[in-house]
C-alpha cells in the first residue's frame, strides 16, 4: 500500500485547509522502512501543516486502531480515510461548507468507487459482488467515514467495523464527484479476504 499511501498523503497536503490536521496511524507490528521515511519526510518538509503520525499495534482489531486514531484528533470532525483510498478534490473543497451548514448531522455516509484489477467472473460469483458498466464493484458501497469528534462516537467490531454512538446522519450523493476512490489488484484482494477470515 506504499504507493497508495504516498499518493493520498501528498493529495491531502495540497488540499487541506490551514485549520485542518493530518493524522496517520500505522501498525507498529508491520512498519515498512519506506513508509517511515515518507512520514518523516512529510513531517519535516511540510512544516506549515498540522501533520502527526503514530505507531499502534493492529492486533487484528480495526476498531481499536480507528478509535486510537480518533483519540489523536483535535478537530470538530474526523474524515477517516484508509491508506488505499483517495477522495476527490470536490469533496474536500466543499466539506467545510457542508459540515457548517448542517450542524445537527453527526455522521455522513460517503459513497465509494471500488475497482479491482484482474477480477474475473469467478471472483464475482464467489464473493457475491455486483459490478456495474463502469467496472465499479458494489457501488455505491456506502462508508461511514465523516463524523463528529465526540468520545461517544466510536468504532465497534474487530473487522467490518461499525460506527456507533451518533443519532443524526446523512448521505452524500451517490455520484462520482462525492466518492472515495478505492483501487486494488486481485492478488491483494484475495490476501486481504483471507486475513479478514482469521479475525
What label would you give each PLM region?
Residues 20, 51, 76, 84, ...:
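Conserved acidic residues
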Residues 1-9:
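A structural helix-start
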Residues 9-55:
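Acidic donor-binding segment of Leloir-type glycosyltransferases
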Residues 55-62:
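Short, acidic/glycine-rich phosphate-metal binding loop used to engage nucleotide
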Residues 62-70, 77, 86-199:
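Catalytic-site signature of metal-activated, phosphate-bearing donor transferases
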Amino acid at each position: 500500500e506504499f504507493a497508495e499511501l504516498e499518493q493520498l498523503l501528498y493529495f491531502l497536503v495540497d488540499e487541506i485547509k490551514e485549520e485542518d490536521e493530518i493524522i496517520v496511524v500505522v501498525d507498529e507490528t508491520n512498519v515498512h522502512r519506506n513508509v517511515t521515511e515518507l512520514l518523516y519526510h512529510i513531517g519535516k518538509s511540510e512544516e506549515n501543516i498540522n501533520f502527526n503520525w503514530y505507531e499502534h499495534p493492529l492486533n487484528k482489531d480495526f476498531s481499536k486502531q480507528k478509535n486510537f486514531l480518533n483519540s489523536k484528533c483535535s478537530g470538530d470532525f474526523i474524515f477517516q480515510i484508509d491508506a488505499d483510498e483517495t477522495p476527490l478534490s470536490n469533496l474536500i473543497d466543499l466539506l467545510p461548507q457542508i459540515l457548517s451548514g448542517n450542524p445537527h448531522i453527526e455522521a455522513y455516509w460517503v459513497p465509494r468507487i471500488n475497482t479491482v484489477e484482474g477480477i474475473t467472473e469467478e471472483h464475482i460469483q464467489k464473493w457475491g459482488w455486483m459490478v456495474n458498466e463502469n467496472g465499479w464493484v458494489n457501488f455505491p458501497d456506502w462508508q461511514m467515514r465523516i463524523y463528529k469528534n465526540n468520545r461517544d462516537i466510536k468504532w465497534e467490531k474487530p473487522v467490518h467495523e461499525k460506527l456507533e454512538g451518533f443519532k443524526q446522519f446523512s448521505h452524500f450523493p451517490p455520484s462520482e464527484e462525492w466518492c472515495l476512490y478505492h483501487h486494488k489488484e486481485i492478488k491483494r484482494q484475495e490476501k486481504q479476504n483471507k486475513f479478514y477470515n482469521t479475525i
